[in-house]
């Protein structure tokens, strides 16, 4: 079986983390599993250098991207990371609502 074939058998965030050798804390995964997988997919999609890699090279690259995605949520949270569209839209709304202090003071 190839690396890609092995990936097709994975179902959960924990499956991916174990298969790719990423050490994780269950509490982080419990809260952020979808966000971690989405960020992992984002990193994979942005990686233009995987074409032509053998299985070992692909596994190393996938592992690095998953480690990075996981670490994003160890150090932060889903809202701050704005992983999903709903979080991105909320951040834009909040930016539109911002009123600088000097705009409130009489001139």
UniProtKB/Swiss-Prot annotation:
Keywords noted in UniProt: Nitrogen fixation
GO biological process: nitrogen fixation
Pfam families linked to this entry: NifW
Residues of the signal peptide: none
Keyword Magnesium assigned: no
Ranges that cross the membrane: none
Disulfide bonds: none
Coiled coil: none
Protein family membership: Belongs to the NifW family.
Role, per record: May protect the nitrogenase Fe-Mo protein from oxidative damage.
Subunit structure, interactors included: Homotrimer; associates with NifD.
Protein name: Nitrogenase-stabilizing/protective protein NifW
